């Protein structure tokens, strides 16, 4: 089934809304909590781990719930409508900075972060499941994901450029108030984007949903070796992404000695590279095996990251920007491939086991994603504290070395592991065509 451009844009609008939050979490939240809200790096690390673990446990349950519930609007689309407004409100609350005692401020951070991640789960799992029901054509799925990830990078533009600028303009010297207002506007925009996604997309297929218990579904899911590979891959990717992305603001401000004014252009460089990567992937995968591209781009990311550590000094501003651009370009080329591969792995599991486990599979992938984010957040907080980071002061040589390591070599190891692991992933275009044929014969 061919999708119209309007529907592809509408589908992408949903992920644009999601990425207002996820980009803020990856690029700004650690910096916001330490340098603006005033939490210690160690407390931020523990916060990230605890909240992500809570959220990760809930993800599979949400996946099962989406499979059980069906409405006249479909199985997955209604969640976008129901949770659009709560999503926008939760974004706003997460960036409020009440003037309270330290422990009360920490409790507020826990409460609002947990609320945000729960709402995020309730809307994200149905959204990522939609790609399996709006079309069964793998080429159209990849194309829709191409639109989707270009729009995620537009969201990244807004978070890395517009939010800091609005924070200065709206805050009038009060950065905390500025971030509250600017992220409140992003939350409102996200709510509208979810409603637009709901209105412009359609669920066209009704996959067979199992009536088995969650425990039995889980046993079948664990027999899906390709799904397990994808789960470990997204965990490793998120470790690399979150560590590098979260420390980028510190790298620009302290290591490159650019202060607050360099944060926005440095982060934006990575966003531009990511947008170009989405466009390049859509073109390259027409001529080259998408799984090979996935694997090799992660190995290239490892090499570039290692070179950046040994080549870029504190005075090499242009070289730092160039390496950051290239790392983000090659690293992000895998995104459309990964997220279109989940639906294909679900089909693979159905062919292998005879049972289709969809909602739990998508929820499980988000479990791995958030587990990786939690691990990365813990590593980030621990290392910032270990290397002696202190907010808004001149950093020691030790803390600067730590920031440089978190920007380059440490995430590089995770990307190398992904590149090696993807050699075990089997479902390329030809393999998936055979899966579709086998499933079609089964249903005939």
Q: Would you name each region that the model predicts?
A:
Residues 1-444:
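Membrane-embedded alpha-helical bundles of multi-pass transporters/translocases
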